[in-house]
Amino acid sequence: MCNSSSEGKEWTKNYVYKYLRNVPNPKFLDIGTGQGTYFRMLNSGYPNAHWTGVEAYKPYIEKYRLMEQYHTMHNADATELYGKNINVSQLHYDVVFCGDVLEHMTKEKAVALVEKLTSCCGILIISIPIIKWPQHDDTNPFQIHVKDDWSHEEVLDSFHGVIDHSKGDSVGVYIVAGDRYIPKD
């Protein structure tokens, strides 16, 4: 969602700083950039980072000046990341953010996307509503919550490789180990 909940953001920031403490030039993939929340939250701590953004709703790219923030910006649906025009599996990212994205697709598509994303990253960070959270938007079709009833337990059961999490009142943040995960002390 464009106006992302602040719940779990500080925990996420601290987790990323700890995970990347010895990585001088990290690579980030931010799926569903919205306003660029994760970029704004972390960019000052990683001046040499490379940021790739993916945003399905083109007006957000213009409105929030995302082309000026991200080194690489794709106007694409998250489910199109493995097509002929964009294939993120051929790239490596230290951290992939999937914030407020998975509730906008069916459970089956969400599980498939997470499985694909873990093949190209160290960690995948999922931020998702864990209460019934219907959402409709007359101007942005990508804002509709297709699966609006995720629970904490269902997230843990559905996405394999969760190594840590922060459960809030309405939003959960889940760290999923990717194929390139390097355990930290």
What are these regions (language model features)?
Residues 97:
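A conserved beta-strand element that flanks and buttresses the S-adenosyl-L-methionine
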Residues 100, 104:
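Histidine-centered divalent metal-coordination motifs
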Residues 1-88, 105-112, 116-119, 123-185:
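Class I (Rossmann-like) S-adenosyl-L-methionine-dependent methyltransferase catalytic domain
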